[in-house]
A protein has these predicted regions:
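Gram-negative bacterial Sec-dependent N-terminal signal peptides
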Residues: 1-21
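A residue-level marker of the well-folded mature domains of exported/periplasmic proteins
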Residues: 4-5, 22-328
């Protein structure tokens, strides 16, 4: 009888011990793997997990930037029984059914960077204020035209995919403020699908189709690097500037070569860090409808749709590129 009681107590102790160290499994889902922006976001996510202590971040994503590929990844995560999914979406609407299924099974859902429609998530974290991002891109283009001594010049946008939520929102915001920047003549929007080779081909196509093109604005960290390379390869340095949203580590060469005068971005490390904290806050039930924790970054204020903004974009140029290219 004593042996049986001892066994029961041992099993109970093991069960309690197991529950005490149970990990919160948070899946950080990128638009696609191999993209420096999302690799940097994962660095921040892992930092958040280390701070929280009881969180395991599973970094994953598809190899192609399609909704179908992300849906396959999401179904796998649902089958694994993760506690939360933090995703940068390839399509705002196509992912809703599978994410609804996840939420029905108790999985918390945060979208970050590129959002999911409200029905498919609980919180969305914009990297910055959308209107400010849009105007920053136009101002950068205007600054580039001024550096080229052009009073009014042709400007093209090289975006990611036609269904990319954040890219489309930023481009819409860019168009709204064009009247404030009369030097900027927007001629077209092209799509490189967040793929280096396609973005490069599209950039070359823009340079050939629009011989008077002066600036390419790419709000894609993949597209901006590809466009800068195209400008260099086509012998357009000093005649065409590339700007938009990019990573200092990937754009340092373009700034030094003269293919880019300046560009902007928020810190993707902070974005992954904040998304992980938000997911953890939802899992632990400490988030409210009005605000949620971003750890050391403070609280994010949420609107009626559950959306909030992290920080303002920051401009990088020859004066600071060396410093920040060593960080991300």
């Amino acid at each position: 009888m004593k042996i049986k009681l001892s066994l029961i107590l041992t099993v109970a102790a093991l069960a309690l011990s197991g529950s005490a160290v149970a990990e919160v499994k948070i899946a950080l889902v990128a638009k696609s793997l191999g993209n420096g922006f999302f690799e940097a976001a994962n660095v921040g996510a892992q930092e958040a997990a280390k701070e929280l202590g009881d969180v395991k971040v599973i970094y994953t994503g598809p190899t192609t930037t399609t909704a179908e590929a992300q849906i396959e990844v999401l179904n796998g995560l649902i089958a694994q029984g993760v506690d939360a999914i933090a995703i940068s979406a390839n399509d705002p609407d196509a992912l809703v059914p599978v994410l609804k299924k996840a939420m029905q099974r108790g999985i918390k859902v945060v979208s970050w960077d590129s959002g999911v429609a409200k029905a498919g998530r609980q919180i969305h974290l914009n990297p910055s204020n959308n209107a400010l991002i849009g105007e920053t891109n136009v101002k950068l283009a205007a600054d580039a035209l001024k550096a080229l001594n052009v009073e009014k010049g042709d400007v093209a946008v090289l975006s990611a995919t036609p269904t990319s939520t954040n890219q489309n929102t930023w481009i819409a915001e860019m168009k709204k403020v064009l009247p404030k920047y009369p030097s900027v003549n927007l001629v077209t929007v092209a799509y490189g699908d967040d793929l280096s080779d396609k973005s490069y081909r599209e950039a070359v196509g823009l340079l050939k189709t629009y011989p008077d093109l002066k600036v390419i604005v790419s709000p894609s960290s993949v597209g901006i690097v590809a466009a800068a390379q195209a400008v260099k390869d086509q012998g357009k340095i000093g005649k065409v500037y590339v700007t938009g949203l990019g990573l200092p580590s990937e754009m340092a060469g373009a700034v030094k070569s003269g293919a880019s005068k300046s560009f902007a971005i928020w810190n993707p490390i902070d974005l992954g860090y904040a998304a992980t904290y938000l997911a953890d806050d939802l899992v632990k039930g400490t988030a409210t409808k009005d605000e949620a924790s971003m750890g050391k970054l403070g609280k994010v204020k949420l609107d009626a749709d559950g959306s909030g903004a992290m920080a303002e974009p920051f401009v990088y140029d020859a004066s600071n590129i060396d410093k920040f290219s060593k960080i991300f």
